[in-house]
């Protein structure tokens, strides 16, 4: 039975969702068609405006086209000549800069090449000298080895002492000869190094001479450029003197002033014509937009009611999903309980078997006692973990139950908010109808103080802070007295905000009816209206309506309406003052209670 009921409810829910989707599609199509028609109408209006402006301004443009074209041609020719001269000067400067940069780069590269050549020559010379020294050392080594060999042979042959002395002198002379040869070689190496240094210095002298010539050429080019600049400066000075003389000439001055006045007059006439045409078109567009806004407000109120009913279906789906999840968890837990019971039975059967055979195995009791102690410890740990697991499950169930309660409260508050917003839109639509009905045709020029767009609350995924703000907006629409607005502006917790919102919806809705109030003078009303505009930022349409109602107090309905507006504005003044005082007193913790209540926690886990 329960499954059949659930299936029927799901079928009904699917049908309702399909109908809602179809209605949304039709609504989107209607909105798109309406937008297309609005765009076409705007295009036609703009085309009419442009046509009228063009026809009315042709008589002024045709007279001045020839003069403008001639002036433009003269100015363009002057600009072309000036641009040509500037381009020529720029090209010359670029050529000079490129030549200078090229010369500098070439000089740098030449200096680098010369340095590399010098280093290469020095490396080659050092390599050559080292090779020569190595060869010389090899020859000396071979000679010395030969002499040692000969000496050893002669010593073995037992020479006389005289021959040995002569041989020793000969070896000394040969060593002196080798030292002298080494000194000669070192001097030759030094001479070669000095010759290489002299050649490098000669190359540097040549390079410095070339740089000197290039610098002289650059100095000459700089001097020529300076002479050209002096000539250009003289020409500009002559032109400046001519311009000053023309400015001091009374004839040219009078003509220029008359031309400026004529140009300004023509421009002002064109602006006047275009502003008249735009004023007429914008006046018609304003009337049409008011009618469209009235229709849109009524449609939005109906859509808000439909969306309020939609939230109930979403809550049903969520609750059904949670119910299925909990049923699955219960089945899983039952299966675990059965498995644990089976394991317990097996464990008891295993314990009973060794108790039967205990009489035969009295000698091997040590190991059995040890295993028994381990099993007891494991059983105690299992029982403790089971207790902790049950505690955690109870905590999880408690948290889920609390989350469900919070979700229920949240859905109830959202439902209440949607109802209040739909009623708010209906009341706004009624107020606009009354304004359009009783508004006089005479237009009064009102200085625009503040421009604010009216945001229509279509998307209703609001948090608790937005609920507080919407309750404040609802207080403005429902025309609450000052004492009750004090109670709504200074809440202590989020629950108080929600309760006050429900009370304001249920109790203070019939206060909108136009009832007679205390008679106030017109001057006091105008003063209060000005103060209210500065504080609250009332739109220009409401201000114009209040001024018109203050000027035309002959009919009783308009008088009652103006009195109602003045009293509402007094209430707004007091509410705004109280809000400022509360914000000054408790600035860092606005609308948040100090205790951690269940409503302040996250409702979804």
From Swiss-Prot:
Coiled-coil blocks: 3-442
PTM annotation (Phosphoserine): residues: 513, 515, 555
Principal subcellular localization: cytoplasm
Gene Ontology CC: centrosome; cytoplasm; nucleus; outer kinetochore; spindle pole
Subcellular location: Cytoplasm, Cytoskeleton, Microtubule organizing center, Centrosome; Chromosome, Centromere, Kinetochore; Nucleus; Cytoplasm, Cytoskeleton, Spindle pole
Post-translational changes noted in the entry: Monoubiquitinated with'Lys-48' linkage. Deubiquitinated by USP45.
Compositional bias ranges of the Basic and acidic residues kind: 564-581
Spans annotated as Disordered: 545-581
InterPro entries: SPDLY_chordates, Spindly/BICDR_Dynein_Adapter
BP GO annotations: cell division; cell migration; establishment of mitotic spindle orientation; mitotic metaphase chromosome alignment; mitotic spindle assembly checkpoint signaling; protein localization to kinetochore
Keywords, sorted A to Z: Acetylation, Cell cycle, Cell division, Centromere, Chromosome, Coiled coil, Cytoplasm, Cytoskeleton, Kinetochore, Mitosis, Nucleus, Phosphoprotein, Ubl conjugation
Modified residues (N-acetylmethionine): 1
Single GO molecular function: kinetochore binding
Subunit annotation: Interacts with KNTC1 and ZW10. These interactions appear weak and may be transient or indirect. Interacts with dynein intermediate chain and dynactin (DCTN1). Interacts with the catalytically active form of USP45.
Annotated HAMAP family: SPDLY
Role description: Required for the localization of dynein and dynactin to the mitotic kintochore. Dynein is believed to control the initial lateral interaction between the kinetochore and spindle microtubules and to facilitate the subsequent formation of end-on kinetochore-microtubule attachments mediated by the NDC80 complex. Also required for correct spindle orientation. Does not appear to be required for the removal of spindle assembly checkpoint (SAC) proteins from the kinetochore upon bipolar spindle attachment.
Family assignment from sequence similarity: Belongs to the Spindly family.
Alphabetized PANTHER family for the sequence: BICD FAMILY-LIKE CARGO ADAPTER (PTHR32123), PROTEIN SPINDLY (PTHR32123:SF9)
Protein name: Protein Spindly
Species lineage: Eukaryota, Metazoa, Chordata, Craniata, Vertebrata
GN (gene name): SPDL1
